[in-house]
Amino acid sequence: MEILRIEPTPSPNTMKVVLSYTREDKLSNTYKKVEETQPRFINQLLSIDGITSIFHVMNFLAVDKAPKADWEVILPDIKAAFSDANKVLESVNEPQIDNHFGEIKAELLTFKGIPYQIKLTSADQELREQLPQTYVDHMTQAQTAHDNIVFMRKWLDLGNRYGNIQEVMDGVLEEVLTTYPESQLPVLVKHALEENHATNNYHFYRHVSLDEYHATDNWKTRLRMLNHFPKPTFEDIPLLDLALSDEKVPVRRQAIVLLGMIESKEILPYLYKGLRDKSPVVRRTAGDCISDLGYPEALPEMVLLLDDPQKIVRWRAAMFIFDEGNAEQLPALKAHINDNAFEVKLQIEMAISRIENGDEALGSVWKQMANRTI
């Protein structure tokens, strides 16, 4: 059994080790401590200083490390463990990229359009928080005797966030309470009881003018306007451009999200403003939007992000260059080859290799890892 390759994952504390051997039992196991009944190579890996657990399924391992441990120290020990156990030369080659490094997915559970729970999901952690009791009470008021609650409830995608998961939860909670103020709950209940919610597709959209937005002094009202904004058009750019200068990060972030929905190269200068925002959350969100659009014209701006102080932003830049870059970006990539964040350094190395070899970009599927049972 050899190591075929080592891949980064969305979690900075987890690496995927792809093996030449595929389990025939189609089972999965999580190992946290050395035990005699376990495979020898698993125990050897668990004996490595810094490794906290190993998830084994199909043909790969998900190896977790302690937050303060260093992958650059651990990975050679992992390779050596396989070499010692199998007496074969491992072939570690071309790690593959994943699109979601550092992301925390935010979702809102609703029933007939009434929110009552938030869920955050990262690569290796899930956090839930119920909204204040009044939201649950109003959700209950919207139920009828014939409602199938399990079928009719719906998770709304609130987009991706970045940072400490508890701090993200605090911020998302504030945004949700702003978007759905308590004063609006009776209206939502009335609508829920009057309308047919068999498909549960209700969402309140309202277009606002630049003058109306500009006249609003309360940032929470401005955020609520943007959160209820329909898909924008070119005519909405002045309003969204104004929102990019808002003092509140959630407002600026939502403006970037809306701008990214205008699928045109003409929107790039406004997304570039997001790349230069003082908040790393806004910068990363702008980088994500640019990556989704996939315009190579953005390469010069994304190259500048290789000097960003936040690794989640630098990683996005390296990822974009991996996908869209060419020989013109090689000098910049090589100048940053010694990035102090291992995950960023790995993406830069992969971008250099892809460009020099002319290979196509590859993605990774993490469904099994996301659904693993610890």
UniProtKB/Swiss-Prot annotation:
Record Pfam families: HEAT_2, Nfu_N, Virulence_fact
Protein's UniProt keywords contain Zinc-finger: no
GO molecular function, one term: oxidoreductase activity
Entry keyword set: Virulence
Coiled-coil boundaries: none
Function noted in UniProt: Required for hemolysin production.
PANTHER family: CONSERVED VIRULENCE FACTOR C, PBS LYASE HEAT-LIKE PROTEIN
Similarity comment: family membership: Belongs to the CvfC family.
Listed name of the protein: Conserved virulence factor C
